[in-house]
């Protein structure tokens, strides 16, 4: 069994598969370049005294703009409270309040249900605990290499072609799990690692797996507006603690919608910027409490010369999360025998057209664990050998980023998506990143109306997220 990717989903899968032997294939050391480490906002779970799973389900369905799969929502959200207990047993140190867990409020949640660790370092704390457990598990091998192709025969997956430097290595496996994260690196500005360019989707496409909902890309409304491609995230939790959107004059402009769903807020921020205004988060009412509550964000701001206790924080939308992906069932199985997917690369049906804040770590952990259990339960097949083969072309996101940002961003139109698709088609034969971008643009063109994170100029608004 091979797991491609070393974030929360991949590590949970490896631990769930134990004591069956599994290899984690990762381009670098565990934790390096993983979006999971960068996740600030927290993990949503209905564990509060005033909360219940039905409320969390309702919030998720509302944010998903009518395109969630209710069964998937009920299953994944329903597993949240038990997941919290599992993570505590694995050594994750969530923040506490008195005798219980500290629970925060974020956009479009009806109750405080967001678990944090070290204020705004939830993903990093989860990864710390999971990496320690993985390294202490003898059945898990970590191999630093880059997956370049899923090898598929008549009866399903047969292995992975990987690159170590310029050398091609064929690794036999009848079960392969993709946990490669998202596609933010296909845009000029992203909250993801710049290296997150949809590698898992490219591998799945090449293998012939079914993909869906590729047009639904969430843009986080509050990335720190500083030079560079990978922009630091200013978590939703900052607004949950009372920060407000203001323009360059200090005037509020969100009309009480500071905690609306992300697609709604991102479009409002984008429109304000397009109109020539500045957009800032004003958290000055928190004063010195800001650095205590959000130490990582305070440090990020300090490096940019900003003191949130006395200055508004400049923000802009940036590509953040991909709701679409490889189509999977409840066990993470794709349409290819032996190929699984979990985490952001997978399309589970949980998010619909727009992800609810802090549901991603929840999904990654629950679905990663489910996929690991399913892989371990699948009967092994006879391994096979291969003739020597060369590496396929490496993906190059550089020529893709300007087109994706211009035409597949917060607001789209048919002419722009058509132009992007034409340009991508010219590059697709020799550039897997362009081949993936082409499918995203075609999915956007096919969805003629606006829904959730897919906002098409002139398109009818089919469903307004609550």
Name these PLM-found stretches.
Residues 16, 29-31, 39-45, 86, ...:
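Glycine- and aromatic-enriched mobile tails/lids
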Residues 1-24:
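N-terminal Rossmann-like FAD-binding beta1-loop-alpha1 element of flavoenzymes
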Residues 68-81, 114-132, 190-198, 223-227, ...:
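Short beta-strand to alpha-helix junction loop
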Residues 167-175, 335-336:
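Core beta-strand elements of the Rossmann-like FAD/NAD(P) dinucleotide-binding domain
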Residues 28-61, 65, 229-232:
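Conserved N-terminal glycine-rich FAD pyrophosphate-binding loop of Rossmann-like flavoproteins
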């Amino acid at each position: 069994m091979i797991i491609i990717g070393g974030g929360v989903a991949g590590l949970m899968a490896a631990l769930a598969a134990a004591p069956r032997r599994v290899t984690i294939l990762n381009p670098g050391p565990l934790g390096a370049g993983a979006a999971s480490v960068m996740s600030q906002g927290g993990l949503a779970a209905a564990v509060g005294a005033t909360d219940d799973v039905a409320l969390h389900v309702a919030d998720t369905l509302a944010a998903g703009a009518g395109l969630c799969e209710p069964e998937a929502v009920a299953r994944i959200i329903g597993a949240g409270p038990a997941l919290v207990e599992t993570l505590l047993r694995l050594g994750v140190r969530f923040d506490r309040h008195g005798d219980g867990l500290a629970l925060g409020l974020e956009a479009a949640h009806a109750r405080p249900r967001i678990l944090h660790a070290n204020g705004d370092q939830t993903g990093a704390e989860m990864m710390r605990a999971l990496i320690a457990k993985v390294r202490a598990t003898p059945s898990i091998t970590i191999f630093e290499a880059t997956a370049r192709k899923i090898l598929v025969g008549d009866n399903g997956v047969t292995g992975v072609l990987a690159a170590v430097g310029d050398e091609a290595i064929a690794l036999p496996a009848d079960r392969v799990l993709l946990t490669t994260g998202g596609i933010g690196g296909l845009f000029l500005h992203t909250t993801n690692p710049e290296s997150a360019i949809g590698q898992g989707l490219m591998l799945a496409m090449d293998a012939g797996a079914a993909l869906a909902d590729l047009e639904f890309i969430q843009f986080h409304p509050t990335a720190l507006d500083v030079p560079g491609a990978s922009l630091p995230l200013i978590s939703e939790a900052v607004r949950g603690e009372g920060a407000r959107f203001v323009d360059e004059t200090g005037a509020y402009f969100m009309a009480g919608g500071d905690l609306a769903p992300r697609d709604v807020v991102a479009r409002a921020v984008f429109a304000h910027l397009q109109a020539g205004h500045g957009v800032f988060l004003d958290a000055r009412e928190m004063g010195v409490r800001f650095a205590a509550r959000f130490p990582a964000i305070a440090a990020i701001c300090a490096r940019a010369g900003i003191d949130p206790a006395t200055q508004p924080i400049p923000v802009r939308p940036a590509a953040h999360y991909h709701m679409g992906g490889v189509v999977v069932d409840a066990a993470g199985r794709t349409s290819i025998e032996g190929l699984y997917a979990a985490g952001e690369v997978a399309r589970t049906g949980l998010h619909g057209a727009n992800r609810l804040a802090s549901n991603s770590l929840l999904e990654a952990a629950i679905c990663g664990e489910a996929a690991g259990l399913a892989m371990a339960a699948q009967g092994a097949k006879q391994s096979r050998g291969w003739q020597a083969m060369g590496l396929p072309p490496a993906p190059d996101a550089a020529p893709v980023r300007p087109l994706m940002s211009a035409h597949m961003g917060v607001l789209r139109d048919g002419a722009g998506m058509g132009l992007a698709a034409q340009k991508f088609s010219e590059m697709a034969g020799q550039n897997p990143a362009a081949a993936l971008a082409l499918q995203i643009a075609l999915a956007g063109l096919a969805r003629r109306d606006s829904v959730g994170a897919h906002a098409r100029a002139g398109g009818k608004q089919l469903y307004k997220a609550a």
